[in-house]
Amino acid sequence: MPEFTYEIVETLGTLSETAKGWTKELNLISWNDRPAKYDVRDWAPEHAKMGKGCTLSPDEVILLRDLLNEIDL
């Protein structure tokens, strides 16, 4: 697996937490020194490990927001 680097630029919020302390978070993350993108992903306590996630550009976040606003909850 290729090596990569990341920096959590800003923590925007926690969506959920498991009994083992893993959290699903929305963060602004810079991957491999590139401009930061929005990222939803599971994190172990202290961000020691990460699970699979979904990275979104600002334009994709706007579209997602619009789609979510159309849902009748």
Where are these regions (language model features)?
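Positively charged, low-complexity terminal tracts
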Residues: 1-73
